[in-house]
């Protein structure tokens, strides 16, 4: 696992340089969920693949930008599932974007997730990593190395409300939930980049991020293996809670396909309790 952690630091620095000077153009290809790929998405994916090819403990890679699992070492232990550049369409307006990683043992199942990480490319280059303990927060220093800053802990109740999806497609239940949060004094914080929005809630020690089921995406839009579960792991290890709107945890999800999606909610315990009160 230490070798994977060190590789994530290398990847962070390489993708950070690409983000600074990238060609923002689109390719002529779509990924598995129908999104037209940006050249920067493809470049970020190739950087990650190249670095993990150097590690003998990595069995295979599963990426948002790859249709199928890419086997590297059949007898190895770890499967890396990742979104190479979450929020890439926001690079041209200079918003913070990020990379998300889930490290699974032997097979992609919720119960096999052993570690998770994300990298955020903003004014500063930062990374959060957990191997099952409290998430650790790192920041790149002037000497070119990542320094440990602190462990992350969510308070029982926050103040931030980051809610995604197009409002006209929300269910009435979700409208009621979001309205109840605003009535309590919650502040809207939503950039359109999952990494940036979830990072802000962690840094501010509480709140909720939601991407609900909608009329146009009844099974949600975010991908279970390489977006949802890695962040669920981080949030729950930080003392928070998660749900798909029905379950007590996103870890109750049974994964049947690589690019499976789900509605998802991540937050402090209070906000997830309120979710269940209103969703039923």
Swiss-Prot record:
Homotetramer. It is found in: Cytoplasm. GO terms for biological process: fructose 1,6-bisphosphate metabolic process; fructose 6-phosphate metabolic process; fructose metabolic process; gluconeogenesis; sucrose biosynthetic process. This is Fructose-1,6-bisphosphatase class 1. Keywords: Carbohydrate metabolism, Cytoplasm, Hydrolase, Magnesium, Metal-binding. Pfam families: FBPase, FBPase_C. Its cofactor is Mg(2+). Its EC number is 3.1.3.11. Belongs to the FBPase class 1 family. One of its GO terms (cellular component) is cytosol. Gene3D superfamilies: 3.40.190.80, Fructose-1,6-Bisphosphatase, subunit A, domain 1. It catalyses: beta-D-fructose 1,6-bisphosphate + H2O = beta-D-fructose 6-phosphate + phosphate. Pathway: Carbohydrate biosynthesis; gluconeogenesis. Binds 2 magnesium ions per subunit. Mg(2+) 1 binds at residues 64, 83, 85. Mg(2+) 2 binds at residues 83, 86, 227. Substrate binds at residues 86-89, 190, 221. GO terms for molecular function: fructose 1,6-bisphosphate 1-phosphatase activity; magnesium ion binding.
